[in-house]
A protein has these predicted regions:
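Boundary/entry segment of secreted carbohydrate-active catalytic domains
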Residues: 1-35, 40-41
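Active-site acidic/histidine proton-transfer and metal-coordination neighborhood
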Residues: 76-171, 181
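Acidic (Asp/Glu)-rich catalytic clusters
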Residues: 7-10, 27-32, 45-61, 77-92, ...
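Conserved, mostly hydrophobic/aromatic
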Residues: 37, 94, 140, 175, ...
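Gly/Pro-rich active-site loop or hairpin
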Residues: 72-73, 110-121, 182-241
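C-terminal helical cap(s) of enzyme catalytic domains, especially alpha/beta-barrels
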Residues: 254-288
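Distinct, well-ordered alpha-helical segments
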Residues: 28, 51, 150-166, 182-195, ...
Length: 289
């Protein structure tokens, strides 16, 4: 089908990182040696400076959240910001959050996700299609939301993600920490996600988290939970068209990053030794070392 064809046209990226400029990109390059870098949205002049410092580096792009709570939806400002960074990095995909960190002028420290029902599915599909049409040179991917409570709305996450991908022909960024937290909250096993659209997964994110009441909250400064790494080994064989696995490490300390990134790479290499960078990908390097 068209979506799978689009995913398969993307070169395999390998094992990379998703970050901004902290920790220092030079240290990341010299010490961690990721296969690719997914940059979180930064001011264009900062993105340009990073791109200039690392010529030949394969970059991907993690944009902001699509404001499904805001009547304006996908604004021209949102599109223009994405286009500017895409023109600098030349990524193959552009990820957006299926959630919101603001309602009006109120900001939250965690994403507020949509109800899993047909109304929000229709709204999210309209906004994803609108954004994909505005950036046709990349494949837009959307991320499974972080649960702050049991997902309301009547649909399962598996059905919601599959129907949204089918309706938009956009790929999926599978955030394993979000999935692991949902499984803990629902006392679920992988059998409960048999209908998940694994074949549409373009990239997997793994990240640190911290316990809060009965759930895990995203905390990229914390170590990765051992259960998340075990889940990575379990889901990788299911993601038959995956192009990359990235460790989300924005603002993590160097000792934690030095410990965690090799663990992620070891899991990937042991379970999916075929996930090696292909032609069209270039190993991260810094000139004049």
């Amino acid at each position: 089908m068209a979506l799978i064809d689009a995913i398969q046209r993307i070169p395999i990226r390998g094992v990379g990182i998703s970050t901004d400029v902290e920790p220092d990109p030079v240290w990341v390059s010299d010490v961690l040696r990721p296969d690719y870098v997914e940059l979180i949205y930064l001011q264009p002049k900062v993105v340009q400076a990073v791109a200039d410092q690392f010529p030949g580096t394969p970059f991907e792009f993690h944009h902001a959240d699509i404001e499904f709570y805001e009547p304006a939806g996908v604004t021209q400002r949102f599109v223009d910001a994405a286009r500017t960074v895409i023109d600098i990095l030349h990524p193959h995909w552009c990820n957006v959050e299926m959630g919101s960190m603001r309602v009006g002028s109120t900001l939250f420290d965690q994403f507020i996700f949509p109800f899993l029902d047909t109304d929000t599915l229709t709204l999210m599909a309209d906004r994803l299609r609108q954004f994909q049409a505005a950036v046709p040179e990349v494949l837009v991917t959307f991320e499974n939301p972080a649960p702050l409570w049991l997902c309301p709305g009547g649909m399962t996450l598996s059905d919601y993600m599959r129907q949204l991908a089918d309706a938009t022909q956009c790929g999926i960024l599978l955030d394993l920490t979000h999935l692991y937290s949902l499984m803990q909250l629902q006392h679920a096993t992988m059998n409960d996600f048999a209908a998940f659209p694994w074949e549409y997964v373009v990239q997997i994110h793994v990240a640190g988290s911290r316990a809060f009441d009965k759930i895990l909250l995203d905390d990229h400064t914390a170590p990765i939970q051992s259960g998340v790494l075990a889940l990575l080994a379990e889901v990788l064989p299911k993601c038959t068209n995956i192009r990359g696995v990235a460790y989300e490490m924005d603002f993590v300390s160097k000792p934690i990053a030095r410990d965690m990134f090799p663990q992620v790479r070891r899991v990937v290499e042991s379970v999916r030794p075929d996930l090696q960078p292909q032609a069209g990908s270039t190993l991260l390097f810094r000139p004049n070392l």
